[in-house]
Amino acid sequence: MEELQGYLKIDRSRERDFLYPLLFQEYIYALAHDHGLNKSILYEPMENLGYDKKYSLIIVKRLITRMYQQKHLIIFTNDSNPNFFFGHNKNLDSQMISEGVAVIVELPFSLRLVSSPESKEIDKSMTTLRSIHSIFPFLEDKLLHLNHVLDILIPYPIHLELLVQTLRSWIQDAPFLHLLRFFLYKYHNWNSLITQKTKMILFFSKENQRFFLFLYNFHVYESESIFVFLRKQSYHLRSTSSRAFLDRTHFYRKIEHFFVDFRNDFHTILWLFKDPFIQYFRFQGKSILSSKGTPLLMKKWKYYLVNLWECHFYFWSQPDRIHINQLSNHFIDFLGYLSSVRPTPSAVRSQMLEKSFIIDIVIKKFDTIVPIIPLIGSLAKAKFCNFSGHPISKPAWADSSDSDIIDRFGRICRNLSHYYSGSSKKKSLYRIKYILRLSCARTLARKHKSTVRSFLKRLGSEFLEEFLMEEEQVLSFILPRISYFSKRLYKERIWYFDIIRINDLTNLS
């Protein structure tokens, strides 16, 4: 970021926030290429254009000019290939422009984050919180004291124009916003945000993934901003007498005028949502709101969120996108795990002088299991088994060497074991490993034109032993003198703080 500040002359850019001229700066596209994007088209050899392996600002300028034209000329050369200067190639155009736009549109947010005093106080030792697994110890500590949850699928905007309007509060450069709006109109389908089922994060095209990821994250940030503000303010409210409580009968009518009377009745409205035991967590397009409150309070939260999305942000919110469930009899489908809080009965023997008593108590226990059915569906989509869970061979890998095939299957198996190490019941995970083991054997047998049984007999019992090694054996290497402890540890949940992305097979489900 320091290198970027030197390029942009931060003091001058803060005064006016002019972003449009940055589109014509060569280092912007160099930064876009160097910051982990896919290989840029601007660096691809363009023999058709007569250019070397480098980007050209002439291309960018002509693409921007063409975006404002009503008609596009298509000029073909002798080999019937469209001329990329004047031809209408939407994929090329959108990728070339979006690479620069994606970097530029992030600048106001990145610079404010770097210059904010809060960012300087961040402890580097807290980097482990980036791990996906770090959220589960938090859930284990908090959910035991709560009763109800709201399973929320964050809605999507009806039109991307709403995102552009929201960006106006952060970006004051009118020409850049106009170009951004025109770019979205011309080169992207507005219905791309209307996703199938619940997958909101998978609609991004591979070419423009960074650009749309930014728009999506900004969309989620704005939708959560007022909710987080209300939540923080409710902590500072003192206990109020019942006369400040709005009439429940007219609650749903009054909530419609929430933003009209926001300033006048702010503390009164906050009293409705005052709940010191509420917890909120989110990953991608799914969020969970848990509370110790009554079902009536959860209904109020649901109605409030729906009205907030529809009336303030103009998001298309369907009633079935928010479900109210009780923690004691409901699984939370989150981050590839099925989590629940189950009451576990136990008997405690109490001795008082000469008499003894047996007391029955119920202890809440946080439980996480592997969702076997979605995982089998993911394996079926990846062609490792059918949808009934019967292992099949992987013909696409049959041309590889034996060691390469074993390494591929082993990598998948180790990643699954690593990601689902926090499961309290390993039976489902063993079944997934069995499917992968037999699929690997079938693939090798197919390659050598043999049966699976004869192939396994020829290799012996040590077949695939290395890449199917259990965590119990790994722990025995780390703790050789306390093997009993390592075996017990393997039966318990293990959370790793080096997992920063969700498992690919979990994303397929």
From Swiss-Prot:
Q: Per the record's keyword annotation, is S-adenosyl-L-methionine included, yes or no?
A: no
* Oxidoreductase found in the keyword field: no
An example Gene Ontology CC term for this record: chloroplast
Keywords of the record, alphabetical order, are: Chloroplast, mRNA processing, Plastid, RNA-binding, tRNA processing
Q: What is its main location?
A: plastid
Compartment(s): Plastid, Chloroplast
Q: What's any GO biological process attached to this entry?
A: tRNA processing
- GO MF terms, alphabetically ordered: RNA binding
Disulfide partners:
none
Q: What does this protein do?
A: Usually encoded in the trnK tRNA gene intron. Probably assists in splicing its own and other chloroplast group II introns.
The similarity comment for this entry is:
Belongs to the intron maturase 2 family. MatK subfamily.
> Know the name of this protein?
Maturase K
Q: Which organism is it from?
A: Clematis florida
Query: What gene is it encoded by?
Result: matK
